[in-house]
Amino acid sequence: MLFHTIPEILSYANEAYGADDAIRWKKSKNEIESRTYSELKNDTDSFANAIEKLGKKGQHIAVIGPSSYEWIVSYLAITESGSVAVPIDASLPAADICELLDRADVRMLIFDEARSDVAEAAAKSCHDINVYVSMNSTEHCPQVLSFNGLIDDNRGSYEPAVAEDALCTIMFTSGTTGKSKGVMLTQNNLAENATCLDMKIGPHTVILSVLPIHHAYCLSMDILKGISLGSVICINDSIMRMAKNIQLFTPDMILMVPLMIETFARKLEEVRAAGLPAEPVRKKIFGERLHTICSGGAYLNPDYVDLFAEFGITILQGYGMTECSPVISTNLSWDIRKNSVGKLMPNCEAKTVDGELLVRGTSVMQGYYKMPKETEETLSDGWLHTGDLGYVDEDGYIYLTGRRKNLIITKNGENVSPEELENALSVNHLIKEIIVRESEGVIEAEIFPDSEYAQNAGIADIRSALQALIDEYNVNAPVYKRIYSLKVRESEFEKTASRKIKRS
C-alpha cells in the first residue's frame, strides 16, 4: 500500500495490526521486552502532544543515541507533529555534533544518556537549543526533561495535519570525502520511498535491525517499511552481539552492509570447504528462520549471492543514496541479477549523461540545507546527479562501474575506475580492505590484509603474497589499468557510520 506521509503509515499500522508486536528489544541477557502497534501509536501521539506543548511544533529537533524504542518514538512524534527531525550519528565527537546542531538550526535535543556529553557540550555552545530531553531519565530535572515523563504528562490522541511536501527530516550524509551535507527530505520523499514497492513481504515478518538507526537505509527500510507491513522490528543492541541476537530474536530478514555479509561469508566458505551439511550450519549461524538478507551501501561481491543461496538464504542487493530517500533500486526475490544493484524503484527513472547515472522521481530530495551552491551542482531540472558511473539495461536494472569523483585519468588520457580494480582484487581472501588510487603518476593499491587468513593459510610473507596477487592481476589487465605500486597497511581504513571506507 502506497503512503505519502509518515503519520499515514503509523495510523494504518495501528488500525491493521494494533494488538500485534511492533518493536522488540533485549531487556536483559535472554529477556525480550516489546510494544504493540497500538502502544507505539499511543506513545507517539503523547510525545507529539508534548512537542506541541513545549512550543516546538514546526521547529528542528535533533535525536541522538543508539537504536532504541525511545529513538523510534521520538522520530515518529517529531514528524507527526509537523516538526523537522534531525537524526545525528551517535558515534561522532561531541564537538562535531554541536557543529551539525548549529548548521541545522536545532532548537530541541533528544538524547540517550550514553551521549550525555553531547547535551553538556550543546548547553555551552549551542545557544539556540533551550529544551533537552533524556530518553533514559525517569524524572524531570530543571535543565533536562524526562522522555517517559513527557509521555505520561501528555497522554492522549494527536491528530496530525502535515502536508506531503512538508520538510520532515534533515539527514546529514556520512560522505567518504568532503564536508557532510544536510539532505532535506519531505514527508512524501520518505513515505513513498518506503512503501512504493511491493517486495512480497507478509505481515509479522521478523526483522533484526542492525544498522545505525540515524542512517537513511535503516530508517526507511527497517523502520518505515517495517511499520507499513506490520513487521516485528527487533533492535540489535550491539554489532558485537549480533550473532547472539540472531539466535535470540530468530529473524526472517536482516538489512546489512557488505562488510557484515563478508564476515558471514568467510564462515560459510569454511563450512563449505570442510564439507559440512548446509542446513544445521545455517541454523547455527543464522537461526531457525532467516531467509533473506538485503544489502546496500557499497559494492557486494556477486559470488556471495550464490554462496548464501547454497545455505538457503537469498541476498537482495540494492542501491541508493541519502539524497534519494534513499532507495533507488533493488533486486527482487523472484528476479535476481547478481551483477546488478537491482531494478529501478517504480517511482524513479534514470538516464546516463557522460557515463554518470542521473535519477529523477518523487524520492529525490529538496536539496542541501543552507547549501545552495552544492544543491545546484547536484540537482538539475529535477535530475539528481548520483556521481556514480554505470548504465541501465532494457529491463530497468542498474549496473554500476565506479564513482565519477574517484576516476583516475592516466598520463595517456585513459579513464580508470578504481572500484573496478578494487572489486577484481578483493575476491582474494588475503585482501580484507583495499583502496586503488593514483600516486606519483602510477596506479597504486593500498591494502589492509587479513592476517588471520594469512596465518591459517601458512602465509609468512604477506607483502610478497600480495605482490604476487597484483602481478597475477596485471598479466591479464590492459597496460593502462595495471597496478605499479603497493602499499600495505597495518590497520583498517577509517570508515563512515555506514561502514564505507573514507577515501581521503
Give the predicted meaning of each segment:
Residues 336-338, 364-387, 418-423:
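Conserved ANL (AMP-binding/adenylate-forming) active-site segment centered on the GW(Y/F)…HTG consensus within
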Residues 34-38, 168-194:
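Conserved AMP-binding A3 loop
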Residues 23-55, 59-68, 72-76, 93-98, ...:
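Conserved AMP-binding/adenylate-forming core of the ANL superfamily
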Residues 18-21, 134, 154-172, 179, ...:
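Conserved pre-ATP/AMP-binding loop-to-beta segment of ANL
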Residues 433-436, 440-441, 471-504:
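Conserved C-terminal "lid"/linker of ANL adenylate-forming enzymes
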Residues 191-206, 213-280:
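Conserved AMP-binding/adenylation subdomain of ANL enzymes
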Residues 92, 109, 361, 367, ...:
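AMP-binding/adenylate-forming catalytic core of the ANL superfamily
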Residues 252-256, 264-336, 432:
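Gly/Ser/Thr-rich phosphate-binding loop
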